[in-house]
From Swiss-Prot:
Is more stable than psalmotoxin-1 (AC P60514) when challenged with either high temperature or human serum. Negative results: does not show activity on Nav1.2/SCN2A, Kv10.1/KCNH1/EAG1 and Kv11.1/KCNH2/ERG1. The keyword Disulfide bond applies. The lineage of its organism: Eukaryota, Metazoa, Ecdysozoa, Arthropoda, Chelicerata. Keywords: Disulfide bond, Ion channel impairing toxin, Knottin, Neurotoxin, Proton-gated sodium channel impairing toxin, Secreted, Toxin. Signal peptide: none annotated. It comes from Heteroscodra maculata. This is Pi-theraphotoxin-Hm3a.
């Protein structure tokens, strides 16, 4: 499976974000891969 790019949904695939990204639950929204801070 290819990794999930930035701003794309990672629901049910929390460990699949591309390098440097992490799955984050946005307020009142869905989970997306975002850059780690």
């Amino acid at each position: 499976e290819p990794c999930i790019p930035k701003w794309k949904s990672c629901v049910n695939r929390h460990g699949d974000c591309c390098a440097g990204l992490e799955c984050w639950k946005r307020r009142k929204s869905f989970e997306v891969c975002v850059p780690k801070v």
